[in-house]
């Protein structure tokens, strides 16, 4: 039994979804993802170098339009968090909504024997037999 070896080509795994995964395919996908991450970091490093060099170039060059006034971009109305300012929202804001509350269960007696064993409501008094009023002697 010690002489048996697993073939790297024919070995497969079956996932929880029932899809059969080939280990070779999984290895290729993980290598490709790692290479993509390395490529992205190299591109980000190059972009950062370009941006820093552009900033250095701009500081040494004179600005062509020094006499121009800046464009005023503020609107006539300022917004605070309470009237819709702040974070960008892509949904309709309807205000605060209270959480859903389950309605109380109905108090129904289905059968006589079931109502005999049921709990009494705390607000209701037990019906007692009315006794006749005591007569006063004259």
Curated annotation (Swiss-Prot):
One of its GO terms (biological process) is stomatal complex patterning. Residues 52-138 are annotated as: Disordered. Keywords: Developmental protein, Phosphoprotein. The keyword Phosphoprotein applies. Residues 69-81 have a biased composition (Basic and acidic residues). InterPro entries: DUF4666 (IPR031421). Expressed in developing cotyledons, mature cotyledons, cotyledon epidermis and stomata. GO terms for cellular component: nucleus; plasma membrane. Residues 121-138 have a biased composition (Basic residues). It comes from the Eukaryota. Pfam families: DUF4666. The modification Phosphoserine is found at residues 98, 105. May play a role in the regulation of stomata patterning. This is MAPK kinase substrate protein At1g80180. It comes from Arabidopsis thaliana (Mouse-ear cress).
């Amino acid at each position: 039994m010690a002489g048996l070896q697993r073939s790297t080509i024919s070995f497969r795994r079956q996932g929880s979804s029932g899809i059969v995964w080939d280990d070779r395919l999984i290895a290729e996908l993980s290598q490709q993802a790692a290479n993509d991450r390395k490529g992205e970091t190299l591109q980000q490093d190059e972009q950062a170098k370009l941006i820093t060099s552009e900033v250095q170039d701009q500081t040494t060059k004179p600005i062509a339009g020094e006499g121009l006034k800046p464009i005023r971009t503020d609107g006539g109305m300022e917004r605070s968090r309470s009237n819709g300012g702040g974070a960008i929202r892509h949904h309709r804001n309807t205000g605060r909504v209270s959480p859903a509350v389950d309605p109380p269960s109905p108090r129904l007696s289905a059968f006589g024997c079931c109502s005999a064993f049921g709990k009494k409501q705390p607000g209701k008094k037990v019906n007692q037999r009315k006794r006749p009023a005591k007569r006063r002697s004259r």
